């Protein structure tokens, strides 16, 4: 398997992120309440929490799919909005166009001689031989690999992952986790992964952030060597620490997070 060709150093560096007093309200409901985050360039961060806690709203704000009610988002010293061209977002649904072949889905929106780059991206995710097939012929995991290739072709500096592995079976999910981790280590982009799976979070991330009732409840550094040994005592201890914090929060589960209409400048992994 080959890897994507060397790119200029600017494109290999992740984007440093900062959220300062970030707030988002929907009517009378405050979904995010003064979130403060500082994420170094190239860090792999997992965001976990109960359904409705605000984690998906946070990712939508980072992706530019929604606007904050207060506070600011920065990429280094500049507004995060200035880094949109270097940002890609993956969803649980691969969102492939069924009337376009795999390689055309990867090169969606590109012009010029993009096909060699698309083949390189597909090769990086192990699907070069499926380039000229239709999406309907692929499994769920393979479709997500295509979505990942569609992001990689743009050499993102920030990759936002909104439960991209949630619908996959256990073995395929682990394979995708390993693939994303390998590509992250290779290219050095910043990653934010929203997941309900605490074991997934501690297995792949440098840092696990727990969102509780719209605020940061726990910010845990996962200081373990890579590749990590699944089922190890140290990994299990970290998973238990996060789970115990989640389960210790009193009260009934919150309502589902509101979803604002998608803006016209939406950028998926394409």
Curated annotation (Swiss-Prot):
Residue ranges occupied by any ABC transporter domain in the UniProt entry: 17-238
EC number: 7.6.2.14
Keyword flag Hydrolase: no
Signal peptide bounds: none
Keyword Repeat tagged: no
Annotated segments matching region Disordered: 250-270
Parts of the chain that traverse the membrane: none
InterPro entries reported in the protein's UniProt record: AAA+_ATPase, ABC_transporter-like_ATP-bd, ABC_transporter-like_CS, ABC_transporter_ATP-bind, P-loop_NTPase
Top-level taxon in the UniProt lineage: Bacteria
Binding site for ATP: 49-56
One cellular-component annotation, GO: plasma membrane
Enzyme class: translocase
Catalytic reaction list: ATP + H2O + aliphatic sulfonate-[sulfonate-binding protein]Side 1 = ADP + phosphate + aliphatic sulfonateSide 2 + [sulfonate-binding protein]Side 1
GO molecular function: ATP binding; ATP hydrolysis activity
Family: Belongs to the ABC transporter superfamily. Aliphatic sulfonates importer (TC 3.A.1.17.2) family.
Complex and partners: The complex is composed of two ATP-binding proteins (SsuB), two transmembrane proteins (SsuC) and a solute-binding protein (SsuA).
Protein name: Aliphatic sulfonates import ATP-binding protein SsuB
Organism: Pseudomonas entomophila (strain L48)
């Amino acid at each position: 398997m080959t890897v994507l060709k060397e790119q200029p150093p600017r494109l290999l560096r992740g984007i440093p992120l900062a959220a300062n007093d970030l707030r988002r309200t929907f009517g009378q409901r405050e979904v995010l309440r003064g979130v403060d985050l500082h994420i170094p360039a190239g860090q792999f961060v997992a965001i976990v929490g109960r359904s409705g806690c605000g984690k998906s709203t946070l990712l939508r704000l980072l992706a530019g799919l929604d606007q904050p009610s207060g506070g600011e988002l920065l990429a280094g010293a500049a507004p995060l909005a200035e880094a949109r061209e270097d940002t890609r977002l993956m969803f649980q649904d691969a969102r492939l166009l069924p009337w376009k072949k795999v390689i055309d889905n990867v090169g969606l929106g590109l012009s010029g001689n993009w096909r060699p780059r698309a083949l390189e991206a597909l090769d990086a995710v192990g699907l070069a031989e499926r380039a000229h097939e239709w999406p309907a012929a692929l499994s769920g995991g393979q479709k997500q690999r295509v979505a990942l290739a569609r992001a990689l072709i743009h050499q993102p500096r920030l990759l936002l992952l909104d439960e991209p592995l949630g619908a996959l079976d256990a073995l395929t999910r682990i394979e995708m986790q390993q693939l994303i981790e390998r590509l992250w280590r290779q290219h050095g982009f910043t990653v934010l992964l929203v997941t309900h799976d605490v074991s997934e979070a501690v297995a792949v991330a440098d840092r696990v952030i727990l969102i509780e009732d719209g605020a940061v409840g726990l910010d845990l550094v996962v200081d373990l060597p890579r590749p990590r040994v699944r089922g190890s005592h140290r990994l299990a201890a970290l998973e238990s620490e996060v789970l115990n914090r989640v389960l210790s929060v009193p009260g009934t589960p919150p309502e589902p997070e509101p979803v604002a209409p998608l803006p016209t400048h939406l950028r998926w992994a394409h």
